[in-house]
Design a protein with these regions (language model features):
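RNase H-like, metal-dependent nuclease domains and their acidic two-metal-ion catalytic environment used
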Residues: 1-169
Length: 169
């Protein structure tokens, strides 16, 4: 019987090669667990899984994953994950107090078919931070961690502008 997946909450954080916090010094991304974090992880990228049996993973899935890991998982796989971003252009601090139930910034990550594994959502970011740039940073870090591209809502593309201006593209 398949166990219910454990959802980890936390934040994404860039890893830098030195003390400078410049885009050119980013060497990777890591997930920092935190009980109130806006990022939810149901399954880390396959190349990040190091434990034996994952919470929620059936015996069949575990055996299939171990077989695949012995073949090639040490490197990042292109096009295994895909993302969708439903963006907002202003943060909570720029939103009127009279605005009822303002929408949140959302990024969803989905794993495509891999081996015997069915496609499934593996992570998401959902928040309306005071500074909208925090949503951009969390989303870009998620995209980098999962090595994936994103589809953007056509009318809310400020995350794209932010990524270009900060040389993530």
């Amino acid at each position: 019987m398949k166990e219910k997946p454990t959802i980890q909450r936390g934040y994404m954080q860039f890893v830098y090669k030195g003390a400078r916090r410049e885009r050119s010094d980013i060497t990777g991304v890591k997930f920092i667990p935190h009980a109130n974090g806006p990022v939810r992880i149901l399954e880390p990228p396959l190349w990040e899984i190091t434990e034996d049996k994952q919470p929620g993973e059936s015996i069949e899935e575990y055996e299939d994953r171990k077989k695949l890991e012995s073949e090639t998982i040490a490197t990042k796989i292109n096009n295994l994950y895909v993302a969708g971003i439903d963006g907002i252009d202003i943060g909570a601090s720029e939103t009127s107090d009279q605005t009822r139930d303002p929408s949140k910034f959302c990024t969803m990550i989905k794993r495509r078919v891999y081996g015997l594994k069915e496609p499934t959502y593996v992570a998401y970011y959902l928040d309306r931070p005071n500074d909208i740039r925090e949503a951009y940073i969390q989303s870009i870090a998620l995209l980098m961690w999962y090595n994936c591209q994103a589809n953007l809502e056509a009318t809310r593309t400020s995350v794209l502008t932010y990524a270009r201006d900060n040389k993530f593209m």
